[in-house]
Design a protein with these regions (language model features):
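Short, basic, helix/turn surface patches
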Residues: 85-91, 127-135, 173-176, 222-235
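ATP/nucleotide-binding catalytic cores
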Residues: 98, 122, 137-143, 148, ...
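Conserved N-terminal beta1-alpha1 strand-loop-helix module at the mouth
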Residues: 1-85, 247-262
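Active-site-adjacent beta->alpha loops and helix N-cap segments on the catalytic face
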Residues: 15-20, 62-79, 89-92, 100-118, ...
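C-terminal helical cap(s) of enzyme catalytic domains, especially alpha/beta-barrels
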Residues: 72-74, 203-262
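Hydrophobic faces of well-ordered beta-strands that scaffold small-molecule active sites
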Residues: 31-39, 56-62, 81-88, 100-104, ...
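Catalytic cores of alpha/beta
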Residues: 45-50, 90-97, 127-138, 179-197
Length: 262
């Protein structure tokens, strides 16, 4: 399992039970969602924030024709940080040191998704046609990314767009937002089934990232209690099991099939 998936698993489980006498052992505080920072390829200041800030990982954004040299420069600056690279199309081979890759294009060659040695995240547009949206659970990827960064703040419409994707998959969902979310917005994202919040590092400061990290650590792992009402049915539970979203299973070896033959 890659580092990103391992951190998502830990966040979904919460604090582990300490060994020894519980009263004498301090439990490690674990936030219910990860905090990831997105930096443009070649952004030296963003890379420094990713290294020095209170982040669970970073994403180097190399979409839109970014130069490979800029991507490589940012990758080299992220030593010691769990990071991935976001490109238009998934690549057969990830940059050295990258734990995961994110891709946006549906035209990505299927062969680029082969192999179990790395974590693959696909960006899904919530406005995708219903017939296609319902098929994403069958794709050989580990998680999905939903970008809500087209709006300055989290709105009801944005939550509806997120719920549209959450309702058709049990995989992890990373949510890209335009600005550092407030405590109330973090609660809404957690309740909507987000496993990680992706924030742009451009314009952010170490202090603002630390403050957001503290807000995450203060969040309970359970959902916010809803106002009592009639005719309310919760659908998200079917897509997001209490034990945490599922992840794709590796393909069985061909040798295993031979063992079953008489």
């Amino acid at each position: 399992m890659g580092e990103l998936l391992d951190k998502l698993e830990r966040a979904s489980r919460g604090a582990a039970t300490p060994l020894g006498f519980a009263s004498a052992v301090k439990r490690e505080k674990i936030a219910p969602m990860l905090l990831l920072g997105a930096l443009a390829a070649g952004d030296a200041a963003g890379a420094k924030l990713a290294v020095d800030g209170a982040l669970d990982g970073a994403i180097v954004v190399g979409t839109g024709g970014a130069k490979k040299a800029d991507v490589d420069r940012s990758v080299a600056a992220l030593d010691g940080v769990t990071f991935g690279v976001w490109l238009d199309e998934a690549q057969p081979k990830a940059p050295d040191g990258a734990d995961f890759q994110v891709f946006s294009s549906e035209a990505t060659p299927a062969g680029a998704l082969s192999g179990d040695e790395r974590t693959t995240v696909m960006q899904v547009v919530p406005e995708l046609d219903d017939s296609l949206l319902r098929t994403i659970e069958a794709l050989p990827v580990d998680a999905f990314l939903v970008s809500l960064a087209d709006a300055g703040s989290l709105t009801v419409r944005q939550l509806m767009r997120l719920a549209r994707v959450r309702g058709v998959t049990s995989r992890w969902i990373l949510v890209h937002v335009a600005s550092l979310p407030t405590k109330e917005e973090l609660e809404q994202l957690r309740d909507a089934g987000a496993g990680a919040v992706v924030v742009d590092l451009a314009g952010a400061t170490a202090a603002s990232l630390k403050a957001t990290r503290e807000l995450l650590l203060e969040l309970p792992h359970g959902p916010t209690k809803r106002k009592k009402g009639r005719g309310v049915v919760t659908l998200l539970a079917a897509a997001a099991p209490a034990s945490g979203p599922s992840r794709r299973e590796p393909e069985p070896d061909e040798d295993d099939d031979d063992d079953d033959e008489p």
